[in-house]
Amino acid sequence: MASNDTCPVCRTAEIVCGKWTLLVIRDLAEGSSRFCELERSLEGISPRTLSLRLRALEEEGIVERHTFPEVPPRVEYALTEKGEALVPLVEDMRRYGRRWLSDEPAEVVPA
């Protein structure tokens, strides 16, 4: 078995398992978004926490920040190719939650 330092599951979990991180990825999977839009969709997240999560995801190359030369300045966040590769994980979690964690019947999606 691989050590935690070389285990790909452990390394991925270190990146995406922080509180709010997968929800930021989930929302950005729908398309680029401004900070205030993310803050509204992630009910309960503080601006500081959102800023920290976005910065950490940027440092990992999962999210990119686009600044537009406008007045007032406009900034949008989007998933990179590396971030898009995490979308199937989010979708799998959605299916799992629908099947095992809710009272509603799960939608059967062929693998």
Give the ranges of each region predicted by the language model.
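N-terminal helix-turn-helix DNA-binding core of bacterial DNA-binding proteins
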Residues: 2-52, 69-70, 76, 107
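Basic, amphipathic "hinge/linker" alpha-helix immediately C-terminal to the N-terminal HTH DNA-binding motif
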Residues: 17, 69-93
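Glycine-centered, phosphate/nucleic-acid-interacting loop/turn motifs that mediate DNA/RNA or nucleotide
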Residues: 61
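Short beta-strand "wing" residues that participate in macromolecule-binding interfaces
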Residues: 65
